[in-house]
Amino acid sequence: MDGQGSTTRISFRNDYSEGAHPRLLQALAQASADQHPGYGTDRHTAHAVALIRHAVAQPQADVHLLVGGTQTNLIAISAFLRPHQAVIAVDAAHIATHETGAIEATGHKVLTVPALHDKLTPALIRPVLAMHGNEHMVQPRLVYISNSTESGTLYTRAELEELSGFCRANDLLLYLDGARLGAALTADGNDLDLPTIAALTDAFYIGGTKNGALLGEALVIVNPALQPDLRYLIKQRGALLAKGMVLGAQFAALFEDGLFFELAAHANAMAQRLRAGLLAAGAHFTSDSPTNQQFIAVSAQQAAQLALRHGIGMRGQFEEQTIFEQRRK
């Protein structure tokens, strides 16, 4: 049965419609049996932070465990920018399309550009900088990217190095949304890793919600200039979780023995198995995604038939074709 009470043979709806991996639930059960100080000052959170610092090879990184992706983006971006400053992102970026104007609600404009495969490049950013050169317009200050992207594509090491160098040369901050960073780092063809991402960005987050956790994202701030006083803003935004051990226990379990990457690799493998079968059946994919996100174009009639039997997310409808987004865990 799906969440609406109808019979569903297989659900491809998303990678976060179930609870959590059993090992994370076990870690939570064990942690909940003890008494803990609140607001992320517990031993589980301290252990998780140490593990993440080790994984990203940044012992001085500031690590904050938060509940969800929109919350993490809002807190990070609003903290990093002055009131007159803006974000540059692709037009399909999550902060520009699926976060209900959360960034704009903090007073920061999101400047969007169309991009091939949903990836930003220096060539796309230069015109934005040229158009915003004085105090009569917002000042571009932060470049927002995601890996994997909204269409499941990946940044290569060379692309991220070029983008990072451009940002540093132009006094721009580089922030990476890692809601599906696990899927990106374990996908076929990927040549990035956590230490490289940490070295090339000012801040990024590691997504747990869409990678087997009950909830949770780990915000990693590498740039020391962006680190002071963030807990004040987290509290002010209502995001300082009283039962912080709920996040700490999960991220400790994810990073103690490689479970984070194990779960991501499994999701990718299942998605590629699905993709191979659908390609053999003649399906048309709108994106060449090596991750657990797969996008398929079908007719309106096919869409209706599929929706009756399977849980599948609809991404959009264009000229009698419906784009279905299928995700595997």
For each feature predicted by the language model, list its residue ranges.
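Active-site C-terminal subdomain of aminotransferase-like
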Residues: Y144, T149, L154, D191-T291
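Conserved C-terminal alpha-helix-loop-beta "cap" of PLP-dependent enzymes
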Residues: R82-P83, Q272-K329
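Active-site pre-lysine segment of PLP-dependent enzymes
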Residues: R157-G165, A169, R180-A203
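Active-site phosphate-binding strand-loop segment of PLP-dependent enzymes
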Residues: F12, L120-G178
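Conserved N-terminal alpha-helix of the aminotransferase class I/II PLP-enzyme fold
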Residues: H21-G69, D91-A96, A102
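PLP-dependent aminotransferase-like
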Residues: F80-Q139
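Hydrophobic beta-strand scaffold residues
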Residues: V87, V110-L111, L174-L176, F285, ...
